[in-house]
C-alpha cells in the first residue's frame, strides 16, 4: 500500500510524519521522501539552490521520482510493505506548473505525460491545507527561505493542490492543518490502518 503526504511548505508535514512513525510503528512502514531518497535528489537540491532553468529543474524532479520508484518504492511494495512518502508526484503537479508558467503552454499536461506508463499511483493521498499566511509564518526568517517559499507562489501551489484533490476525490483526503497536531496525526493514522487492512495493490498510473 502506497500512502503519500502532500501540502505546501509550512503545512506541518514533518511534524505529522514524525508522529506517524510512532503511531504506526507496529505496522513497520517504510518512510521515504521526494526529493532526497536517492542520489538524484542531490542534483535536485542543487538545482533549487542554484536556480537552474525551470525545464531542467522539472526534469531533475522527474528523474528523482523515477529512481525513487525503481530503487525504493517498487521493491518495498513487492514485499507487501506499507510505504509512506513525504511528497510524491503530486508535488510536481502542484509546484512545477507555477515555476513553468510562461515557459510552456500547458505545464501540467506536459508533466502528466512524462509520468505516464511508469509512475505508481498512490492508494491514498493526505493533503494538509491551511491559510498560506499561517504556513509562511512557520517558515522562519524570509532571508533563509528557498525561492518558492513565499506567499504568492504558495497561494498558487495550494490552489493547484486543491484542484488535484477535487479531480480525484477517491484518492485524496483533504485535512485541516490548523487542527491540533495530535488530532491530525491520529486521524490519518487511523485512516492508514483501515486502508492497510483491506489494501490491494493498484495498477500503475
From Swiss-Prot:
Q: Which residues bind ATP?
A: 7-14
Key words of the record: ATP-binding, Kinase, Nucleotide biosynthesis, Nucleotide-binding, Transferase
Q: Which InterPro entries match?
A: P-loop_NTPase, Thymidylate_kin-like_dom, Thymidylate_kinase
Q: Does the keyword Kinase apply?
A: yes
Query: Catalysed reaction(s)?
Result: dTMP + ATP = dTDP + ADP
Q: Which SUPFAM superfamilies match?
A: P-loop containing nucleoside triphosphate hydrolases
Q: GO annotations under biological process?
A: dTDP biosynthetic process; dTTP biosynthetic process; dUDP biosynthetic process
Record's superkingdom?
A: Archaea
Can you cite an annotated GO cellular component?
A: cytoplasm
Q: Which GO terms describe its molecular function?
A: ATP binding; dTMP kinase activity
Q: Give the EC number(s) under which this enzyme is classified.
A: 2.7.4.9
Q: Which Pfam families match?
A: Thymidylate_kin
Q: Which PANTHER family match?
A: THYMIDYLATE KINASE, UMP-CMP KINASE 2, MITOCHONDRIAL
The protein's matches in HAMAP family, at most eight in alphabetical order, are given as: Thymidylate_kinase (MF_00165)
- Name the protein family: Belongs to the thymidylate kinase family.
Q: What is this protein called?
A: Probable thymidylate kinase
